[in-house]
Amino acid sequence: MLLPVHYQMEKFMNKIVSTLGIMATVAYSATIYADEATSTDSWNQIEQQAEGETVYFHAWGGSQEINRYLQWAGKKLQNDYGVTLKHVKVTDIAETTTRLLAEKAAGKNTEGSVDIVWINGENFRSMKDNALLFGPFTESLPNWKYVDKSLPIDVDFSEPTEGLEAPWGVGQLVFIHDQETLHNPPQSFSEMLSYAQAFPNRLSYPRPPEFHGTSFIKSLLIELTNNNPALAQPVSEDNFQEVTAPLWAYLDKFHKVAWRGGKQFPAGTSESIQLLDDGQLDLAITFNPNSVYSAQASGRLAETTKAYALESGALSNIHFLAIPWNANANAGAQVTINFLLSPEAQSRKGDLNIWGDPSVLSSKYLTGSAKNTQQFKSIDEPHPSWQNALEKEWLKRYGN
């Protein structure tokens, strides 16, 4: 029996649609596999280019634990990829920013002296604004898939990262005390001032613009102003003095009763930890909640020491790795950063007996004590422009 023409046409069209659907699925799958193959081939080329390169990594050099960790990473990179890692120890990464600005001004767009920088905040914003960074590159790293995307990795002190820097770890400003000598440490900056007045010469903080010192005064300003909304906006000459007035009033009082009368300050977290261990200070400061464990393991702190955050929480941020636009070892830099994001490298970095730096990977990819690193309630950083303004004013008032 002959079917109606329109019915035959409908069956014919259904076959065509079905066939096209299968073809589209096959084509889509082929595209995915082709993209993956291209991506793999591209990364293989980068690894081949990286072999034999020397990577100059500009990073803070004020921690024995961090320095030893980078020595381990250097051995792994040499053995596994043929990449030589040179840790260029800097006191303040702003020195590296100045170097890169000079190279930019001189038209040195290749064969630069810096291959990787460890940065965040104001230094990232400065490098980004002056087009000093290579990228975006982060999502092309094979180990990017392990990164915990629930972390605020797409912003750095409110500045969009736009793939120009890869997250490396999580920082939180906390204090360390010895439970045997100070059972109930101050839980706020208000209590800290009262403690210093009751027990003069026992408290201090690193001298700004050292990172920990600047973080101390930012955290103090947030508490004193009840986290004034102006701090989340670019700093303004119109409101700077008004917003920061409580900060300088507090520090004027604090310095009078601080260690050495506020005339001298620890150079950084390492010295504050040493002064705590020597019994000269009752509190040390760190941006790593777990550094107390590695310091205990290396004999730098007593087993009775403990890290804690103030009652309101801890100033918190992500720290990042970036590649300058003119890096001489660009391929080697990408391979290095990719390795530092591997579960192996992040697990070792997070090991409480090695560095204890909280990882940026999802915990399911971590092993050992890195899976259980301690984190406190977080307080957001102010807008990065406040950092430079606060440091300048601090130096003007107390720098001599």
What are these regions (language model features)?
Residues 314-381:
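Mature extracytoplasmic/periplasmic domains
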Residues 100, 127, 272-277, 323:
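Hydrophobic residues within well-ordered alpha-helices
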Residues 124-126, 283-302:
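A ligand-binding cleft/hinge motif common to bilobed small-molecule-binding domains
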Residues 60-72, 88-97, 110, 114-270:
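Extracytoplasmic ligand-binding site segments that recognize negatively charged/polar headgroups
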Residues 42-51, 58, 63-84, 175:
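Short, polar/charged alpha-helical segment
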Residues 36-42, 274, 373-400:
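Conserved C-terminal helix/tail region of periplasmic/extracytoplasmic solute-binding proteins
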Residues 10-20:
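Bacterial N-terminal signal peptides that target proteins for export
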